[in-house]
């Protein structure tokens, strides 16, 4: 037998065996994939031919106390291209450049980019989006989205806040109530062929979006408008740095208005305000393009800042409301108690002056309050002592925050009890050497005159689903009694006398009983001679339904609170009291004060 033939047959046999083994292995693998992994690969194949697109949910609206929409949504479009679906790139580039006003190089780069989806432009007006859709360009998608829109532009800008590019809240109520306002996006799954082109009339899975809840708030657009108008008048007349006004219902803490002028345009929040009073900021606003990014962001943060809650200041004589209430509640002073004011008071080694250089002479405590006499309130503070004063400072809720439903509330800056000597006690008694926020002052004053119940300042009333099927009411229970009804009634009487016969006369309003207190506080450092003029008022004095606080930062010329701040609140009340249904009356205040 031929040995070569035998060897050749063996080689053929080995090769046949190897082929058989490979075939069996491939058959086994194929059987495994077809039987056991078919579901997996079917899903992969389906995924390759499915395209998921988001259906944006509408953000909930913000609605004022009268049902007026003050934060809404506008339909806008996002223009994008899908590379595999574009059939005429030059035509697509030409149309998009022309209609969107974009640079050709930019559009070409995006149209020719090999990606599943490339965004050309966002926030395109719906009218223009519809026009582009009408071209029926292969591979060009026009998807509808929502953009936040504020019908009143700058009204209550630092209260409402605004949203970012992702339609999420950034500042103000927009961020505080984000979980209620934001909706839940839906999605749509469409089928496409091997080239990625959508198959028309193919079955699709669709999950509908759920719109966010509407937020109903206590802010009243009409009161806010008028308060802003008055604030801007003062800002311009006194060339002030800024002006703030807070309007509150002292019975429950509902905020009807909160003004911080200059405000900014909510529909264009990243452009520096050209109305900034500070010369340095004006120059920066005019040179926005030249500002480093970090510097511009710093200026934007300053522009967005809500003075009423984010900033602290020395309240000055408006804080005498707290000292008087503590003194009366503790019993260390009564209205007819006699005091003497020679124009100063010496405490330890310090000579602390009254605003009236020649002094007020002999006066009762009531007269001292009407005259806003520093020595009288220094004496009341000394009678209380450090322990007593600290007790009421804490009891009245001044050491903590108010709990207002806005982000970034600043805390009170106060001496530590162990570091508070008689001099510090003296200056605190008439509103100096410590700092609080305007919202803390008005909240505490409201709690003193409303019968003695500590309230929580707030805007949020309820969140209502788009289909009205769900209503979530926000609760703000009283934080407890801080002083007796008797002391509260006495304080209402005292503060009415301040307006009717004392330093707050310019807030007097014919036919109405108004209570209030003036203040002129000197800013730090004292050497600069810069002032904050303020006035806090409420009406009717015997049954407070509305309270307002104005602060005027660095007014030029005459700067006394009783002269420039009190008249503003008088004008405000003249317009909003009838609007709120509070009728004028010539009756005298019916207040019973024990041991007058």
Question: What is each model feature region?
Answer:
Residues 1-286, 303, 312, 334, ...:
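Periplasmic/cell-envelope proteins involved in peptidoglycan metabolism and beta-lactam response
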Residues 71, 193-204, 219, 250-318, ...:
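Beta-lactam-recognizing serine transpeptidase/beta-lactamase-like catalytic domain environment
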């Amino acid at each position: 037998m031929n040995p070569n033939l035998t060897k050749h047959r063996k080689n053929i046999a080995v090769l046949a065996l190897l082929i058989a083994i490979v075939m069996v292995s491939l058959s086994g693998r194929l059987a495994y994939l077809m039987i056991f992994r078919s579901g997996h690969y079917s899903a992969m194949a389906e995924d390759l031919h499915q395209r998921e697109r988001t259906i944006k949910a509408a953000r909930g609206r913000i609605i004022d106390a009268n049902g007026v929409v003050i934060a809404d949504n506008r339909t806008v479009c996002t223009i994008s291209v899908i590379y595999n679906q574009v059939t005429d790139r030059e035509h697509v580039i030409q149309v998009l450049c022309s209609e969107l006003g974009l640079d050709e190089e930019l559009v070409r780069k995006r149209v020719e980019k090999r990606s599943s989806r490339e965004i050309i432009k966002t926030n395109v007006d719906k009218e223009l989006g519809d026009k582009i859709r009408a071209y029926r360009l292969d591979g060009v998608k026009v998807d509808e989205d929502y953009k936040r829109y504020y019908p009143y532009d700058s009204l209550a800008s630092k209260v409402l806040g605004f949203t970012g590019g992702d339609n999420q809240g950034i500042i103000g109520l927009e961020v505080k109530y984000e979980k209620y306002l934001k909706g839940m996006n839906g999605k749509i799954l469409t089928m496409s062929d091997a080239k990625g082109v959508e198959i028309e009339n193919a079955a699709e899975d669709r999950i509908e979006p759920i719109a966010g809840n509407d937020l109903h708030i206590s802010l009243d657009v009409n009161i806010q408008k008028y308060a802003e108008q008055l604030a801007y008048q003062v800002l311009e007349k006194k060339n002030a740095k800024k002006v703030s006004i807070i309007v509150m219902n002292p019975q429950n803490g509902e905020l009807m208005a909160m003004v911080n002028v200059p405000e900014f345009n909510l529909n264009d929040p990243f452009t520096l305000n050209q109305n900034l009073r500070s010369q340095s900021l004006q120059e920066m606003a005019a040179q926005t393009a030249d500002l480093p990014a970090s510097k511009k962001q710093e200026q934007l943060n300053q522009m967005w800042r809500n003075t009423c809650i984010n900033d602290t200041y020395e309240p000055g004589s408006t804080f005498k409301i707290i000292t008087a209430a503590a003194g009366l509640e503790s019993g260390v002073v009564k209205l007819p108690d006699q005091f003497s004011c020679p124009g100063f008071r010496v405490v330890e080694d310090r000579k602390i002056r009254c605003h009236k250089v020649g002094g007020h002479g002999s006066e009762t405590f009531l007269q001292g309050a009407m005259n806003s006499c520093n020595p009288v309130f220094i004496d009341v503070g000394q009678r209380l002592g450090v322990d007593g004063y600290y007790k009421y400072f804490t009891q009245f809720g001044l050491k903590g925050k108010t709990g207002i439903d806005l982000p970034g509330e600043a805390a009170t800056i106060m001496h530590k009890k162990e570091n508070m000597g008689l001099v510090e006690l003296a200056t605190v008694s008439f509103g100096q050497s410590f700092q609080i926020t305007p919202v803390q002052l008005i909240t505490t004053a409201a709690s003193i005159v409303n019968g003695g119940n500590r309230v929580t300042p707030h805007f949020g009333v309820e969140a209502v689903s788009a289909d009205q099927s769900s209503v979530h009411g926000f609760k703000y229970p009283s934080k407890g009694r801080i002083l007796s009804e008797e002391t509260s009634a006495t304080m209402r009487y005292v503060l009415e006398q301040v307006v009717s016969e004392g330093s707050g006369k310019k807030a007097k309003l014919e036919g109405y009983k108004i209570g209030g207190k003036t203040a002129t506080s000197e800013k730090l450092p004292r050497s600069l001679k810069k002032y904050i003029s303020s006035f806090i008022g409420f009406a009717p004095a015997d049954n407070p339904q509305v309270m307002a606080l104005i602060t005027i930062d660095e007014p030029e010329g005459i700067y006394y609170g009783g002269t420039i701040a009190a008249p503003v609140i008088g004008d405000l009340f003249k317009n909003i009291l009838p609007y709120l249904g509070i009728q004028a009356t010539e009756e005298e205040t019916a207040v019973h004060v024990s041991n007058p």
